[in-house]
Amino acid sequence: MDLFIVVAGIVGFYVAWNIGANDAANSMATSYGSRALTLKQIIIIASVLEFTGAVFFGKKVTHTIAKGIVPIELLDHNLVVYGALAALLSAGFWITISTYYHLPISTTHSIVGAMVGFGLAAVSQNHLTLDQIKWDVLARIALSWVISPLFGAALAFVVFSLIRVLLLDRFASESIEHVFRYLQVLTACYMAFAHGSNDVANATGPIAAIMGYSGGVPFWVLFFGGLGIAVGIATWGYRVIETVGKQITELTYTRGFSAEFATATTVLLASNFGMPVSTTHTLVGSVIGVGLAGGLASVNLKIVQKIIFSWIVTVPVAAAMTISLYTMMVVFV
């Protein structure tokens, strides 16, 4: 079993690296698109804040991913090990592919889809029944995929429209934009910290399940997860940052602030209602909303179509990959 923990640690680090590479765009892309920060500054700031958030505030969400979808307490521990490893590998592969093609997918939905695949594979082999999978949790997640980007888009549209009417149309735009440059950087830093605390669980949750999770997440698991995210941002984070920050619509400081403020507010409201939402989906929706405030022509619809397609296929692809890997492990290992 010690060997499996070592393997899980390596695979978990790989998934955390993927999270950093893809999800760095959640917190810092709009700051890059509006030129509030350079790419080098973004990599340094995001790496530090994501790592800090993951290490010191990542325990609670790790608990949810470890036990919130598949009832691991009802399964033989060897099956839990196979399923969690298969989920980590599948989510990691899919995130790598998406990052290569500059697509901002939800790493949360990747690991959720992978864990669903684990549960369905266990059902197919009569280790679980279909009603033992926690479908109510999955229903809330599915609902969040629709609500969060739409709400983020609407709120960003309203916020930027108010800024334009109350400030930009009345005062010198250069002085207003200068003030919002600093406000946007502060918002981005907060989002990076919050994202690290939430999404590190996508890598550490399955590791906790493999270790026979009983309530206490070891510090080294969170440390490794946070380190993996930081390394991912530093080495490959620029790919998706460019897509969200520059290719959807043109971003100024006020536009970038509006998108980040709308995203943070949407995620906070969802948390108060216990709704698990994707920061990725919410931010992309918010960026689109800001673009629409300038008219439909200012939004790159081809990029938006590619992003939406990647969202739709994430869960079934991650689930199918997990089912295949899990089945091979059960048969051959």
Curated annotation (Swiss-Prot):
GO terms for cellular component: plasma membrane. Keywords: Cell membrane, Membrane, Phosphate transport, Transmembrane, Transmembrane helix, Transport. The chain crosses the membrane at residues 1-21, 37-57, 79-99, 103-123, 143-163, 217-237, 284-304, 312-332. One of its GO terms (molecular function) is phosphate transmembrane transporter activity. This is Putative phosphate permease AF_1798. One of its GO terms (biological process) is phosphate ion transmembrane transport. It comes from Archaeoglobus fulgidus (strain ATCC 49558 / DSM 4304 / JCM 9628 / NBRC 100126 / VC-16). Potential transporter for phosphate. Belongs to the inorganic phosphate transporter (PiT) (TC 2.A.20) family. Its main location: membrane. Pfam families: PHO4. InterPro entries: Phos_transporter. It is a multi-pass membrane protein.
